[in-house]
A protein has these predicted regions:
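A generic structural signal for residues embedded in beta-strands
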Residues: 15, 68-71, 168
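Conserved mixed alpha/beta catalytic, RNA-binding, or beta-rich assembly cores of soluble enzyme
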Residues: 125-235
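Short, Lys/Arg- and Gly-enriched loop/turn segments at beta-strand edges
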Residues: 20-32, 76-86, 174-184, 273-275
């Protein structure tokens, strides 16, 4: 796709997103705000493939294959006072166990940043973008946004909230970043196939990195480094996330691979990112403070 915006490395951009099909929009008389562009998109933009509504792509001048795009997630805000969650037969982590489709509309309180679940529970909101990615390699052809891959995409990592940084390998000139699939809250795994799906606005700073070499997404929070494994086999995901963390530790500290492997066993946290996107995800977290002491 041609870029909708071209920026310089280091620039900040505010990106508005929407989510959901016509069947997910609540009735007009329920007091829920629906961004007008969601109606426009469904009227004017037929879907090319199953997947998400994304905003982008954003081109970064001078971005070349082999570089890394650093995305600082500076702020995330809710754009509407509701979200939705569904069970879809033959989807999710237990695809044959729940055979009745179900959809719930979830009221969101933007002042208290809580969600009111229909069975009486109140959940804190911690919004993030489920999909953040650059253009995949051209030789992959046209692909759906549903499966995450080396270019990022539908990562669904709940750690990627405001104040964190995502690093993506660049495969095409301009990088061509897009995002969407806003989540108000999600558990590790996203087991029933959806989170609290909602419209978000994000403020990002994009920077080109020539001093990094990545083949899969990587991230960091103020306190932790995060490595990822993305594959249809969850065991392979685990191996890749662990191997990537070992490589990160040895690069940042000079520890041997054996010492780094042992440190991962003693202090690293392996977590299930998601189990529902075809390609599954595992991520490993390691405290930055430990690596500072080991350097």
């Amino acid at each position: 796709l041609p870029p909708c915006l071209e920026i310089d490395s280091g620039d900040c951009v505010v990106v508005d997103t929407v989510t959901g099909g016509p069947e997910h929009i609540p009735p007009e008389n329920k007091g829920f705000h629906v961004p007008s562009e969601l109606f426009d998109i469904h009227r004017d933009c037929p879907a090319m493939l199953p997947g998400h509504i994304l905003t982008g792509p954003i081109a970064i001048k001078g971005a070349l294959p082999g570089q890394v795009l650093q995305i600082d997630i500076l702020d995330i805000k809710l754009r509407q006072n509701w979200g939705w969650n569904i069970i879809r037969p033959l989807a999710g982590t237990l695809p044959h166990e729940f055979q009745t489709a179900r959809k719930v509309t979830i009221p969101l309180d933007l002042k208290t940043m809580t969600a009111e679940l229909s069975w009486g529970l109140e959940l804190p909101l911690n919004p993030f973008f489920g999909v953040m990615g650059v253009a995949p390699p051209r030789n992959w052809g046209r692909i759906s946004s549903i499966q995450p891959r080396a270019h990022g995409g539908n990562i669904d990592n709940k750690e990627l909230i405001a104040g964190t940084t995502l690093y993506l390998p660049i495969f095409e000139e301009g990088a061509l970043f897009s995002c969407g699939d806003g989540h108000g809250a999600q558990g590790d795994g996203e087991v029933c196939v959806t989170a609290i799906e909602t419209a978000l606005s994000g403020r990002f700073r994009f920077s080109l990195r020539d001093d990094m070499a990545l083949h899969t997404p990587q991230a960091e929070t103020p306190t932790d480094f995060i490595t990822m494994g993305i594959h249809e086999d969850l065991n392979r995901c685990t191996e890749d996330a662990l191997r990537n963390m070992i490589n990160l530790i040895t690069a940042k500290t000079g520890l041997s691979r054996e010492d780094a492997y042992m440190l991962c066993s003693l202090a690293g946290d392996l977590r299930v990112t998601q189990t529902v996107n075809g390609n599954k995800g595992i991520h490993m977290m390691m405290k930055k403070s430990l690596l500072e002491k080991a350097a």
